[in-house]
């Protein structure tokens, strides 16, 4: 499920209405940040407002809050700039190596995302979107194929 949380965060597929941390602090997501493909936190340069204070830094995502400890982040200074810990399950309060608490957000997985995952996993079609093709108008299809046609010329 962690990879699904990454996807939801990266593409902002969550409801931003009345978001609250696990400590019931009002939070507003300004920028989800840049996805990190190397070691260290999952996203860099994120910006959030928590209880009226703007925070800028990194975001780490785990299925369970306790994964923070299991992965050794609690003693790793690379994670001291984490401003938000996104989890599916809040089973532990987490801290940086200097013992300051890290705000946590339980990111709910939207029903539509779960439905799409279920559909993709249970569909045997080699073209996952074939049923939706008739709904796309011809002009859109021409526009989509234009870069390919330009490359052929």
Identify the residue ranges that each predicted region occupies.
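N-terminal ordered "arm"
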Residues: 7-66, 73, 79
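Intrinsically disordered, low-complexity acidic/polar segments
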Residues: 55, 68, 93-95, 114, ...
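Short, surface-exposed linear segments at secondary-structure transitions and domain or protein termini
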Residues: 65-71, 112-117
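Single conserved hydrophobic/aromatic residue that forms the stacking wall/gate
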Residues: 142-153
């Amino acid at each position: 499920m962690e990879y699904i949380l990454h996807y939801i965060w990266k593409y902002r597929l969550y409801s931003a209405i009345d978001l609250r941390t696990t400590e019931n602090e009002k939070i507003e997501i300004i920028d989800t940040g840049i996805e990190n493909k190397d070691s260290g936190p999952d996203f860099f340069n994120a910006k959030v407002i928590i209880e009226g204070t703007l925070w800028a830094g990194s975001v780490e995502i785990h299925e369970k809050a306790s994964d923070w400890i299991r992965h050794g982040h609690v003693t790793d200074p690379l994670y001291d700039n984490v401003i938000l810990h996104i989890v599916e399950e809040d089973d532990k309060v987490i801290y940086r190596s200097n013992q300051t608490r890290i705000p946590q957000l339980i990111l709910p997985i939207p029903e539509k995302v779960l439905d799409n995952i279920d559909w993709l996993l249970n569909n045997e079609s080699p073209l996952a979107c074939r049923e939706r093709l008739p709904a796309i108008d011809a002009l859109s299809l021409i526009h989509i194929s234009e870069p390919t046609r330009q490359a052929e010329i």
